[in-house]
């Protein structure tokens, strides 16, 4: 006997859990109760299959993320366009920083006192779904987005970090199968390009997470997956310079988007890899002109041998040189305010300075450049160096200023033999001051974008950064002289003279910052806020000592603080220094009011108003 009649039970019997007789069009129970008998013939499955909900959740997250990115880009394009009714030229911030915009824009017509920063939040730890990852671990992107990020990198990042050969990179950028080091480098390049872009800034979080994961995976992943060595030291895998470049770019990106301590850890990792690969000894065996011949042995390339190398070989060698000097500049300048000991010292470097950018990218045979110590000793040679080589020389000069300050702090005065130590101090001080003054005089004048005549000067933000760096060295030397205990009247007179030089240098920095167009802040070096804060701190501490401070003193401090406000929208280091500067200015206002009266009150009111505007726009 059948336990159940054929057909489906009606909804009323299913609700009551009663035995339906399945009579159509109305069963007996529904007929007795006077209810409508409803039978559902087709029902949906009782539950999802295994993994179906997880897949739907990933797809939904990806769709929502893309929609939010597109919505943010549309909102940014509609809100950040600058209208011509403001007396300024209309600039589309969603486009890349094109050289044609530089020709048409002007320096004086852009009002730096009305900041409109794009809102970039600090990077937060996120998890990227496996469906968005390629087998290499990279984030899956469309071909158009990859091309845009590569273009943005060479327009905005490469001018301040010129260590990659464009043609060589583009030859393998679109390949699906590349080495792990090149995959990490490609992802790091696109990560920092997105971080310095207005249209891809929201997408940089996922790119950063993928790049960081790829680099850390290369650290813990051995050739056979074991945590101990299974080969001899000589047969272990070599450190590819693309891996060092990826860590350096990640460190630059973290200066923009993360706390300074995290960025210092990434830069330390890059320097340690660089030391293991011995990139500082590339040209040790060039000839008898090598300055440091006591270092360990490493493969090197002599100038005569370089002329006979194929294009790919000498380009790779030059990339290694530029990788070393990029790490050297970052190591020197990241300690501008903290006096943190550097890890790369000029005494250990046996690598020639980088060749001119035009020759490097154009594929011309390299001209042998000089070494850093001999270039520092011949001040006349600095005029013929490229912008990147000048940046290396000036970064080393600033590093010597920090070492000079550290030596002065280690000596206590007065003590036995203090007179000879005082002479040594002023001898070092005068040499450094003369080198800094010569650098400020020989620097090419910074031109407005519409005044640039050539491709090199038109798109070279490193030249303006070099000038600011030379002025910052003058300020650092003045602070060192002020901090030292004066023994004689001559010491006091010398310190006052260096203060006058530093004051003029701080005004020049403020003038350069004032003339800079707002869109140029997307192409500034990540450690530029250190130099801006150094100048603002010097003007803040020296201005109250004068009886009647000039009006341009107040304007200089104001422009420097507003510049930090602009940079804070794209640079986390600038955001931290802006908060610190705001606290310093508030503390100095109470002291300065007693000395100077209402002028400082006006400055404080003006500066606080602009900082409040920037904080309001950032919070929105």
From Swiss-Prot:
CDD domains: fungal_TF_MHR (cd12148), GAL4 (cd00067). InterPro entries: TF_fung, Transcription_factor_dom_fun, Zn2-C6_fun-type_DNA-bd_sf, Zn2Cys6_DnaBD. Its main location: nucleus. GO terms for biological process: DNA-templated transcription. The keyword Acetylation does not apply. It is found in: Nucleus. SMART domains: Fungal_trans (SM00906), GAL4 (SM00066). Keywords: DNA-binding, Metal-binding, Nucleus, Transcription, Transcription regulation, Zinc. GO terms for cellular component: nucleus. Residues 10-37 bind DNA. It comes from the Eukaryota. Residues 291-308 have a biased composition (Polar residues). GO terms for molecular function: DNA binding; DNA-binding transcription factor activity, RNA polymerase II-specific; zinc ion binding. Residues 285-308 are annotated as: Disordered. Disruption phenotype: Abolishes the expression of the entire sorbicillin biosynthesis gene cluster, and consequently, the production of all sorbicillinoid-related compounds. Transcription factor that acts as the main regulator of the gene cluster that mediates the biosynthesis of sorbicillinoids, a diverse group of yellow secondary metabolites that restrict growth of competing pathogenic fungi but not of bacteria. This is Sorbicillinoid biosynthetic cluster transcription factor 1. The gene is sorR1.
